[in-house]
UniProtKB/Swiss-Prot annotation:
Expressed by the venom gland. Keywords: Disulfide bond, Ion channel impairing toxin, Knottin, Neurotoxin, Potassium channel impairing toxin, Secreted, Toxin, Voltage-gated potassium channel impairing toxin. Blocks Kv4.2/KCND2 voltage-gated potassium channels (IC(50) is 193.0 nM) by shifting the voltage-dependence of channel activation to more depolarized potentials. The toxin is thought to bind to the S3-S4 linker region of the voltage sensor domain. GO terms for molecular function: ion channel inhibitor activity; potassium channel regulator activity; toxin activity. The presence of a 'disulfide through disulfide knot' structurally defines this protein as a knottin. Signal peptide: none annotated. It is found in: Secreted. It comes from Theraphosa blondi (Goliath birdeating spider). This is Kappa-theraphotoxin-Tb1a. It comes from the Eukaryota.
Length: 35
């Protein structure tokens, strides 16, 4: 399966976001990992 891009909805407990992105627990979408 393809990874999730920016602002795609995601599950924080099963993070499928693309590399250098993380699932935001508050908004439930993928965002850039700043650190």
């Amino acid at each position: 399966a393809a990874c999730l891009g920016m602002f795609e909805s995601c599950d924080p407990n099963n993070d499928k976001c693309c590399p250098n992105r993380e699932c935001n627990r508050k908004h439930k979408w993928c965002k850039y990992k700043l650190w």
